[in-house]
């Protein structure tokens, strides 16, 4: 008997979040403008199965509100924002943006999605760190 590997179908919104994290990471490491990052991303990435409108909104709005997002999460970090791993920083910024501004998305969905994205892109225990921070941020934003 052979074991069949069952791949979960990744939702268009999950793919949008993954793309937004990648774009935020690129923005952070390249220091290029968000508009330039978005333009390059849209031209160069395979966006099949991605909710591109949601990706664009997440990336643009997270970048635009980065100072507010950072100020929300700073009290719950164990280090300076500048010392965070760039991937963890991108994931946390995106999730905190969603918790604060995307009120139609339940907080549990935001946290779960951030954990799943951290499992894909982050270091071995990134998902635990992301979960710990977001679990403290959500109640402060009256989302829990």
UniProtKB/Swiss-Prot annotation:
Q: Which InterPro entries match?
A: NusB-like_sf, NusB_fam, NusB_RsmB_TIM44
Its GO CC terms are:
cytosol
Q: Can you provide one Gene Ontology molecular function annotated for this UniProt record?
A: RNA binding
Task: State the superkingdom.
Answer: Bacteria
- Asked if Transcription regulation is a keyword of the record, the answer is yes
One Pfam family, short name: NusB
The protein's UniProt keywords, in alphabetical order, are:
RNA-binding, Transcription, Transcription antitermination, Transcription regulation
Q: Name one GO biological process term.
A: DNA-templated transcription termination
- Tell whether Hydrolase is among the UniProt keywords: no
NCBIfam families per the UniProt record, alphabetical:
nusB
The record ties this protein, via PANTHER family, to: ANTITERMINATION NUSB DOMAIN-CONTAINING PROTEIN, N UTILIZATION SUBSTANCE PROTEIN B-RELATED
Give the family this protein belongs to, as stated in its UniProt record: Belongs to the NusB family.
Annotated protein name in UniProt: Transcription antitermination protein NusB
What is the organism of origin for this protein?
Pasteurella multocida (strain Pm70)
Whichever gene encodes this chain, its name is nusB
């Amino acid at each position: 008997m052979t074991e069949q590997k069952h791949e979960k179908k990744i939702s268009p919104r999950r793919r949008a979040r993954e793309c937004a994290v990648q774009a935020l990471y690129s923005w952070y490491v390249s220091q290029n403008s968000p508009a330039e990052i978005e333009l390059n991303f849209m031209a160069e990435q395979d966006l099949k199965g991605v909710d591109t409108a949601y990706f664009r909104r997440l990336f643009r709005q997270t970048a635009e509100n980065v100072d507010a997002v950072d100020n929300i999460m700073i009290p719950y970090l164990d280090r300076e924002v500048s010392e965070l791993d760039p991937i963890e920083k991108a994931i946390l910024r995106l999730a905190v943006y969603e918790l604060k501004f995307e009120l139609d998305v339940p907080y549990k969905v935001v946290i779960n999605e951030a954990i799943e994205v951290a499992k894909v892109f982050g270091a071995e225990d990134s998902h635990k760190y992301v979960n710990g921070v977001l679990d403290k941020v959500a109640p402060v934003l009256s989302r829990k």
